[in-house]
């Protein structure tokens, strides 16, 4: 007996699955792995503990002719609006370090990451940034943090 054709849903560029562990909802399995590695090494950190404003919001008073952000809709004046701030929430914040686990970056991440690096350099000069992209790099990150804490 032939199975009926099942149409696959189109997925976006980021294909991470949401995972729960210890009562915390993680955005990906890699974030959960990092949390477990930090916990096993007894390194204190907060998961998504703080949100940083990379660029303040403002009121755009000029006229601007464009379509909606999704490229649809009518081409018309969409100016004179409040522009929202650009914010960034790293995955883990600890004493002297910030960790951003990133499997596959989305479209806006590279720009946010550069702006965040600039903010850290100016406001937190003695903070080390880590961006592990797989479990091996998560383990290496924990090793580096432990050697730094000694």
Where would I find each of the regions flagged by the language model?
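Electrostatic, structured charged patches in enzyme active sites and in nucleic-acid/phosphate-binding
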Residues: 1-150
């Amino acid at each position: 007996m032939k199975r009926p054709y099942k149409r696959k849903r189109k997925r976006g560029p980021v294909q991470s699955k949401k995972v729960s562990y210890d009562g915390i909802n993680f955005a990906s399995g890699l974030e959960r792995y990092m949390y477990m590695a930090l916990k096993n090494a007894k390194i204190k950190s907060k998961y998504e503990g703080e949100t940083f404003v990379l660029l303040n919001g403002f009121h755009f008073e000029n006229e601007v002719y464009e379509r909606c952000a999704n490229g649809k809709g009518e081409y018309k004046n969409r100016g004179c609006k409040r522009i929202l701030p650009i914010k960034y929430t790293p995955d883990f914040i600890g004493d002297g370090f910030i960790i951003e686990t990133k499997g596959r970056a989305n479209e806006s991440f590279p720009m946010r990451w550069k702006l965040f690096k600039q903010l850290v350099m100016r406001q937190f000069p003695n903070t080390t940034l880590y961006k592990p992209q797989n479990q091996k790099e998560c383990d290496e990150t924990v090793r580096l943090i432990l050697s730094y804490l000694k």
